[in-house]
């Protein structure tokens, strides 16, 4: 019997279905799911990452898995404050927290080496790219296929489409162009409105993000304090967005506004918005970065891996990290890991 999620994709069974893993996001977010010692947290991170892949593979009839990894990011050169807050947070870690973080990165490298060397999954990384760039690039390079993005990152909302879904194994939440669904396939209820959470509007969500900035990535707002819905005397995001294509009064009224920051520097909204588009829009990277994205994907897929006995290799990996629950169902976990990329 087909699952709920397979019904979402009715009529497009001839397409390939790629499971695209935001690897570091999934692995490191999983550490916060359980309390306990470092071994417990590492075990949970491994389990949730592999289980997310297995579940997405089964629910969406996957055909190939792609693990996307982080580089330093070109955005730090384009915009100096980008993710500077992450380093500030690391500098504030206690000795115990710092040691735990180091161990997690070491284990993550072990996991990365396993999927790179012992499975047929495509694994992509470039020193200048973030996983977001590679995931978006893969979707854009395979427009006639289906894609399931495994991540908790809200940045992927802009990619949601009839052929692109996002799944969080940590929250057991699925986001499609039709709405937000829990693990049973039921629509998610918005905690504020007490009503069904409306389906995402990718284009407006991206516009709002470029206007408001992103505190988690230290991307500053283009227009601090801007309202979503305007008032009688002031244009809001909704009105400006509706006027985006025609570039009429409401658009210009907002974009030509000026404001002064805490250091006395004057900003024009349009200038900061344009900067944020380059930082946030996963179709708007600079031309040289777009070339790197394309080249990285082509290099990763030119010679698809042909690794044999992936199931046995998984069993050895499970034994090394004491993952008995996964070892007991190794055939189900191995299936997505042994599927080759077909050109």
Regions found by a protein language model. Give the residues of each.
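Generic N-terminal initiation segments characterized by hydrophobic and/or small/turn-forming residues
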Residues: 1-4, 203
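Short, Lys/Arg-enriched N-terminal segments with co-localized hydrophobic residues
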Residues: 3-14
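Non-catalytic nucleic-acid-binding/docking modules located in mid-to-C-terminal regions
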Residues: 16, 55, 59-69, 84-92, ...
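Noncatalytic, basic helical substrate-engagement surface that gates or grips nucleic-acid strands
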Residues: 16-150, 156-181, 189, 281, ...
